[in-house]
Amino acid sequence: YATSGYPRFTEAARYWLQWAGFPEKVYSPSQGKNDYTDDYKCRGEWVNYLAGGSDILPDSSGLNVPLDLAFAFHSDAGTTKNDSIIGSLGIYFTGKGRKTYGKNTPRQVSRYLTDVVLTQIADDIRETYEPEWNRRGMWNKSYFEARVPEIPTMLLELLSHQNFADMRYGLDPRFRFLVSRAIYKGILKFIAKQNDYEYQVQPLPVNHLRTEFIGTHEIKLTWRAVEDPLEPTATPEKYIVYTRIGNGAFDSGTLVSDTSYTKGIIPDSIYSFKVTAVNSGGESFPSETVSLCRCSQEKGTVMVINGFDRISAPDSFEIDTLMAGFDTRKDFGVPYLYDISFIGEQYEFRRNIPWIDDDAPGFGASRADYETRVIAGNTFDYPYIHGRAITNAGYSFLSASDEAVTDQLVALNDYRIVDLILGKEKQVKIGRGVTDRAFKTFPESLQTIIADYCENGGNIFVSGAYVATDLWDNGDVNETDKRFANEILHYTWRTGQASVSGQVKPAASPFPAFDTLHVEYHNTLNENCYAVESPDGIEPFGKGSYTIQRYGENNIGAGIFYRGQRYNTCILGYPFETIKTEKQRNELMNAILSSFDQTITHQ
């Protein structure tokens, strides 16, 4: 025997159960002779061992855990050469001869469990992202995982991991959340029905977060509740505010009844907040994180806007029935927080190449060099990174979500400087694109607010990988978008995919603060920060706008600075928060903020 050396998140059930301390009869029914059969057989044995000795399985020995049900989450195989979706299948087993589970529960109950969960999944997917999602039906078959557990059991085959049309959805974090919530709702409804009680579904995360100073040593945090259009019971009743000071951990939270929270602060300390919504059904996922700091010797206050909301699957393409796939080198997508499922780049794009062997899997085949690695995604915590650099430069800062700004809940004109975080924000579709594309860098409402802010003398710093490509090369070009970039922010698009080196060097300009700054940003997949595969090449537009940075390998413009009579702008074609070292982030932020305050030096 030899250990794999792989992380435990890749571990099969058989070895996880052994490591967790379960007896050999549970994790290895074959007594060590067959890992493959042990892996699928041990799951049902594990369920029975957990429940053994409890009220639901009193005649067996075990850990006395009164389980309500067992649920096995699978994906299936199967391909189509077009946009057809394989879809979802439910499997249960009502038994041959034995019509009840351990405590005389009818085995027919498993059919009801399967039906309610499968119905919830299909209904929610069809209502949101894919009206043609295929509900394949329900099978009453003697699969080991369905037959052996002595409690109501369902096997779900959610989609085909082998089919491109299915995986366009399956790789998207938004779809994963929707399906996971649907499964949770289906199980909740089943348990409530079995026990004859009313249920309530946990709320969705709150949005519209914003912070403000209401005194020298006090701040106010506000947000909005989010109703669930798919579930009327998921209404928030209260909220929990979690606080982090500096780079410490978040506290255990403060329960509040309203959609606002005030707190005393200590100057020169960075405070960060995230909020969850709660009701009798449970607690929502956390909101994005907003941060702030009151500097005791402040030069001014910067408003940081988090406009990086995107989570999505990798870029994908299809050429009729001939070729299709995911182009992770162009855009890996954006995982929610992190991803552990990516194994490597796809290399076989020909639809007609069949599966021959697991080592020659045909269409969709991918490399295996990332099987053991964790890939960083969107942490929704970037105001903190920007804020550290801002406070290092001597400025206080507040932060807000972009929706709070576009809904005019934040008065930008109260702040001399704005820092807009765009990260890898860009317009993307989900699946085959039935619904409108999401995550536009500069929606019309934001353009209007930024234009008004600039015309009233504001200074704005914007950084993001698609600050220009999303306006010029998105498949649906809008001349108004381009005019906004040209005439308000004073930059123009040169090219997407401008660099692969991850290195930026200074360019000759009238702004001496940038003359010696070299920057290196994350351009490959890693566990610390999301990667920028395709930064933007941008150029200055109009009088007073100059290139201040270029990409290291080709001299394509990476950043511009505009000094006008009424306002200033600084635009970067790569995200500021992806810069690898805090020293480089501090130096660049200081150069930007100080240049906003200085008179232009003519060459």
Predicted features, each with a name:
Residues 343-479:
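Helical hinge/lid and interdomain linker segments adjacent to catalytic or ligand-binding clefts
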Residues 262-283:
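Beta-strand-rich modules
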Residues 190-233, 281-300:
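Pro/Thr/Ser/Gly-rich low-complexity, intrinsically disordered linker/stalk tracts
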Residues 424-532, 545, 552, 588:
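A glycine-rich, often tryptophan-bearing local segment used as a flexible ligand/cofactor-contacting loop or short
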Residues 142-147, 535-538, 548, 552-568:
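Short, surface-exposed beta-strand/loop micro-motifs that present aromatic residues
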Residues 251-258:
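Short beta-strand segments within Ig-like beta-sandwich modules, predominantly Fibronectin type-III
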Residues 54, 69-99, 128-196, 573-578:
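Active-site-adjacent mobile loop/cap segments within catalytic or ligand-binding domains
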Residues 1-86:
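Catalytic-core regions of hydrolytic enzymes
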